[in-house]
Amino acid sequence: MSAMTRTNTPAAPARATTIRRFLFRGERPCHRHPVENAGGSAARVRLRVLAAFLPVTAVLYVGAEALDPRGTDQVVISTAVALKLLPIAAAHSSQLYLSGSLSVLALGGLAVSYAAIAALVTGRGWVIATIAALLGGLGAFAGAMLNVLGGVNLAAAASGHMARGAAARFLVTSFGSVPSQVVEYVYFASEYAAPVVMGVALWRSRAVPRWLAVLFTAGLEVAGSMGAIGPKVVLFMLPFAVAMILLAARIWQAARPAPMTSKTPTSAAAAAPDTTTPLLTSPGS
């Protein structure tokens, strides 16, 4: 046999196999697939958009309550109450329109804010957070309908060209209808239940400090129970606004991309000497 002839062909080293996998299969160490990068970027952008709703909702909510004329937050259950509210509404009809519009926008933002806060709870308590988001969204929707009845309809009845008695009967009929009463019950039940349920979810999940969960629950409960007392309502709603801003910052931080590590495990085949490659022998062996 010739000295340059081998009895068998040595197998390719493991290093070459790794290189071929990188070149032909599209694999790269410490690199993510383009589809994964695009999906992660889209999710982060959506989460940050949701986070922006929290401070905007706080501003709208506080502004709506501050602009609400004094004494106009009553539920019209009789003609006497309607006749009492109509002169106040006639004197502040533009203010009522603005306050009612801001209330509808604030309640819509509150529904989105509940969904954004629930996105923070991904581990323990995520079921409770989901229930709280559903309750909050339902209550916000019912509250928007009730604010249209209470604010916008009151301003329309007061500024319209109709007799006081006819306007009072219109308001009593609107508030006394069965759909209006159902919406009212749903709103008041969800308004007080949703913050407590979400606070429990945040407390159990440890996604935020526990004092922030308490601040959110207490602040939103106080904000929802405030009446039309004028601009000083801002002081009572300040804890709610602070909690919403802090939660928005937490959601924004959660949307940051995870850091990538550059460490790649070294394969045992590449680290160990290749035992499958035969040794070259001299002609005399």
Regions found by a protein language model. Give the residues of each.
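Hydrophobic, aromatic-enriched alpha-helical segments typical of multi-pass transmembrane helices
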Residues: R6, I19-A268, D274, P278-S285
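N-terminal intrinsically disordered, low-complexity tails
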Residues: A12, T17-T18
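Low-acidity, Ser/Thr- and Arg-rich intrinsically disordered low-complexity segments
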Residues: S2-R6, R15
